[in-house]
């Protein structure tokens, strides 16, 4: 089985990402974010383990790819879980990708990415940091094993100062939980050097909703009807009503406009709100 795969193999009509590949050096994720979707399709999704024969498989896959699309690390895990500090699987994969001449997109919640700046600044690269809140108490409950938001913001600044384009994913937005932080997150991201914001609303699946019920019962009581009575269903996920999603995303878009950042939404079906050529920030990759 390939480890460097086509992104979005299900061809979801709501996915507007440009063509790219996806590589997950690890199966599962240690960050244990309550809202995470991977537990709906990865057994033991919060148990992080290295892929077997990873480097051999990456080398073989890279030789077979004939289109120089970006390689995204990672979409079903974080490429910088705590164990990466010792194992260095992502770092080795980056070396292999660089040797093969592919551009790369990093998607992470970890400041450990700054360890690899020596490699990344020599590659065609864009780094995307997910920041859902600036409140360390909320973050520690919502994303218990991820680095706190202040460390992520420092990493945004550090990566940006090396001349590497940085985007921030405000993802997910929760009504009644983190929505009051929208404007401040965008402002702080801009101050730290981010160039683009990708935003998305919380789209619970059965397992992630149950985790939220246990950790944030008041939030779930307030929003249950929004998701399950007047909201929409898309495959196994629940969506807020389109009018509320548009309202939240317009706030992000307006905040971006005020500080000079581009904006896009993710899997919302509202591409008309986007102000960037791509939804994922890969338009920021340097020309070869």
Language-model regions: role of each:
Residues 71, 104-106, 127-129, 166-170, ...:
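Hydrophobic faces of well-ordered beta-strands that scaffold small-molecule active sites
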Residues 105-106, 174-184:
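Active-site glycine- and acidic-residue-rich loops that bind
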Residues 87-89, 150, 180-186:
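Charged helix-capping and loop-helix junction motifs
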Residues 72-81, 111-114, 127-146, 173-175, ...:
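Conserved radical SAM core fold
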Residues 145, 158-179, 235-240:
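Conserved strand-turn element in the central/C-terminal portion of the radical SAM core barrel
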Residues 1-128, 132-137, 153:
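Conserved Radical SAM active-site core
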Residues 95-98, 121, 156-162, 253-257:
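Surface-exposed amphipathic alpha-helices with a cationic face
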Residues 5, 180-288:
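Auxiliary Fe-S-binding modules of radical SAM enzymes
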């Amino acid at each position: 089985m390939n480890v460097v795969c086509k992104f979005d193999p299900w061809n979801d009509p709501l996915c507007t990402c440009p063509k790219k590949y996806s590589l997950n050096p690890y199966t599962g994720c240690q960050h244990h974010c309550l809202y995470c979707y991977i537990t709906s399709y990865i057994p033991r999704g919060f148990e992080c383990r290295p892929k077997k024969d990873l480097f051999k498989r990456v080398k073989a896959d890279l030789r077979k790819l004939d289109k120089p699309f970006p390689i995204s690390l990672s979409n079903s895990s974080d490429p910088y879980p705590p164990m990466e500090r010792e194992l260095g699987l992502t770092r080795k994969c980056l070396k292999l990708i660089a040797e093969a001449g592919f551009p790369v997109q990093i998607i992470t919640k970890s400041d450990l990415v700054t360890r690899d700046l020596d490699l990344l600044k020599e590659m065609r690269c864009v780094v995307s940091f997910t920041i859902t809140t600036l409140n360390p108490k909320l973050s520690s409950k919502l994303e218990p094993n991820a680095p706190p938001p202040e460390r992520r913001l420092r990493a945004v600044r550090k990566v940006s100062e090396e001349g590497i384009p940085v985007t921030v994913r405000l993802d997910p937005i929760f009504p009644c939980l983190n929505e009051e932080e929208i404007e401040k997150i965008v402002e702080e991201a801009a101050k730290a050097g981010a160039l683009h914001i990708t935003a998305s609303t919380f789209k619970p699946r059965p397992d992630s909703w149950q985790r939220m019920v246990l950790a944030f019962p008041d939030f779930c009581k307030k929003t249950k009807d929004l998701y399950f009575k007047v909201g929409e269903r898309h495959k196994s996920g629940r969506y807020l009503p389109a009018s509320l999603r548009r309202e939240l995303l317009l706030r992000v878009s307006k905040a971006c406009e005020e500080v000079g950042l581009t904006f896009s939404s993710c899997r919302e079906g509202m591409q008309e709100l986007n102000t960037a050529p791509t939804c994922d920030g890969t338009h920021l990759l340097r020309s070869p």
